[in-house]
Regions:
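Structural motif
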Residues: 140, 270-271, 327
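Pre-catalytic or accessory/regulatory segments outside the catalytic core
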Residues: 1-155
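A domain-level signal for caspase-like cysteine endopeptidase catalytic cores
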Residues: 20-25, 31, 37, 54-55, ...
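Well-ordered, non-membrane alpha-helical segments in soluble/globular domains
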Residues: 87-96, 122-125, 214-221, 305-316, ...
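Extracellular/periplasmic catalytic domains that process cell-envelope and extracellular macromolecules
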Residues: 69-71, 133-137, 191-192, 264-267, ...
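Cysteine protease catalytic core and zymogen-processing segment of caspase-like enzymes
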Residues: 162-174, 280-347
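Short alpha-helical segments and helix-capping/turn motifs at coil-helix boundaries
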Residues: 58-64, 120-130, 134, 181-184, ...
Length: 347
């Protein structure tokens, strides 16, 4: 078990050098990095308001509203003000499908203005940052565009009380393909996925980061007990929901295993959870756009080495991948994208 004296081993491997993207950080330095900066005055006012009004803030939907039912909790798509008409039209099949299922008062097409913080976006639409009013800004939000259009900090702030997703593709055709895929899946007469959760967690020799993620995260989730205790499968979340588990942990967490799961070559999982290093590349490296955030597999031979055979990148996912209905969690450095500029590791 880690102790309070241990340095923090941050997730991420440099795709050029094969070394840690950021060296281990001592706790004092980490505390300094985590201290509020820039918008600290707003954060302080927000903290004080929460302290003074604890009973007024639930960060939740109104009493009696079922969050698992979009018809009650509401759904909205959020476009940047400058989103092209082509992208908007590409998503129209999905928007029309949602409109047909959700009452008009709980369905919205919203606009995000450039540079707008989350609380101003919500205020402009008549909603607070805390509690959810589905008829104003619903519980389910779909942001359209990359972090250069709608910043990550806006997404994270909205996520305090809402279920927020994001679509970011390069072309209108890709948005259209996504929309058509979702509508086809939801209108299908049968569910193609199996009631199975896939668990993928490499552990590299001499790497404290993946030792912790494999032993303290993936194994307890997959087996219902820490790595140093006997498995208790009946205690797992998957078992309680009557899902089977298929695990690839430590030596089994290969690139081939993950690609097989993603392409649905055997059993098509309904849920996939991975915990690994993600790759990071310098700004002037041609591989940054294609391979940033790629998942480092057990095939990696160790510090100082790096080849495409060691990781799973977007380019490894072929057009015949059977991803329909898959809910995937990629716990990795840059696993959800890369902001510009990167401020995560700066003090």
């Amino acid at each position: 078990m880690p102790s309070s004296e241990d340095p923090l081993f941050l997730n991420g491997i440099d795709g050029v050098t094969g070394q840690y993207l950021v060296p281990p950080v001592g706790l004092p330095a980490a505390a300094k990095m985590a201290a509020p900066r820039g918008n600290a005055s707003y954060l302080e006012r927000w903290k004080n308001w929460l302290f003074d009004n604890p009973l007024l803030t639930k960060f939740d939907t109104p009493f009696g509203v079922n969050k698992n039912d979009p018809a009650q909790a509401g759904w909205a798509v959020v476009f940047h003000a400058q989103t092209s008409e082509e992208v908007r039209k590409s998503l129209e099949p999905l928007i029309a499908h949602r409109r047909s299922l959700i009452p008009s008062e709980q369905f919205h097409v919203l606009t995000y203005q450039p540079g707008e913080p989350a609380h101003k976006f919500l205020s402009r639409h008549g909603a607070p940052l805390s509690d959810v009013e589905p008829t104003r800004v619903p519980y389910y939000l779909l942001l359209v565009g990359g972090p250069d259009e709608i910043p990550f900090d806006v997404e994270h702030s909205l996520s305090l009380s809402r279920a927020v997703g994001r679509l970011s593709f390069d072309t209108p055709a890709e948005y259209a393909r996504y929309a058509e895929s979702v509508v086809a899946y939801e209108k299908g007469s049968s569910v193609p996925n199996h009631r199975q959760v896939g668990w993928w967690g490499p552990k590299h020799l001499g790497d404290r980061s993946t030792e912790l993620s494999a032993h303290q995260l993936v194994i307890p989730l997959a087996r219902g007990a820490p790595a140093d205790q006997p498995p208790q499968p009946t205690r797992t979340i998957a078992s309680k929901l009557r899902y089977a588990s298929n695990e690839a942990i430590e030596d089994d967490a290969t690139k081939e295993w993950l690609l097989t799961a993603l392409h649905g070559r055997e059993v098509r999982p309904a849920v996939l959870f991975t915990a690994s290093h993600g790759l990071g590349f310098p700004a002037n490296d041609a591989r940054q756009r294609s391979d940033q955030g790629a998942l480092l597999s057990q095939d990696w031979t160790g510090f100082g080495a790096m080849t495409p055979a060691h990781y799973v990148a977007a380019s490894d996912i072929q057009d015949d991948a059977r991803l329909h209905g898959l809910v995937a969690f990629f716990f990795a450095c840059f696993g959800g994208g890369t902001p510009t500029p990167v401020s995560l590791y700066t003090s």
